[in-house]
Amino acid sequence: MKKALFLILDQYADWEGVYLASALNQREDWSVHTVSLDPIVSSIGGFKTSVDYIIGLEPANFNLLVMIGGDSWSNDNKKLLHFVKTAFQKNIPIAAICGAVDFLAKNGLLNNHSHTGNFVYLWKDYKQYKPISSFVEKQAVRDKNLVTANGTAPIEFTNLILEMIDFDTPENIEKMMYMNRYGFYHFCDKYGNPFVD
């Protein structure tokens, strides 16, 4: 079974990973787990979450790292940086959104990838941010095994991740995202009612 680790820090943005987590968790070939610096974290929306793994005790093998944004990514924790750098070195598919992209920029981990984020101006003082490719002003960007997105793009973020991991056919992924973006009735107008033969 493939394993997705959702990296959530305290005050994580709970809306950013829900489309992806629910898609993965409904499949028999994927399992969803949480990892953090602390055993219990709270979301911006007030959800207390007991995480599955503490950084340093996470499984050695996993198939996807999803870094959920929030208010704690200005973190200089060495264990956190080592964990993320190791995932890059292992060429594990990685997805980062919102404040998590800021963390990657600050630590020079975007330099070899096309990328987006909340706003490039926020990174002007990051000494390690020396990208080969320019910042892309799009909701979400995929380059090789990395997806980045701004905090208002959970659906676009999910779409590119599902494509990156070959979750389903492009057509089926597009249908799933269409329903999430426009709702059930617009979906029925375009594709027909999935509950009626």
Swiss-Prot record:
UniProt-listed Enzyme Commission number(s): 3.2.-.-
Family matches, as Pfam families: DJ-1_PfpI
Assigned keywords, A-Z: Hydrolase, Protease
GO molecular function: peptidase activity
SUPFAM superfamilies: Class I glutamine amidotransferase-like
Active site: 98
GO cellular component, as recorded: cytoplasm
Domain PfpI endopeptidase: 29-166
Keyword GTP-binding recorded: no
Family, per entry: Belongs to the peptidase C56 family.
Record's protein name: Uncharacterized protease YdeA
Originating organism: Bacillus subtilis (strain 168)
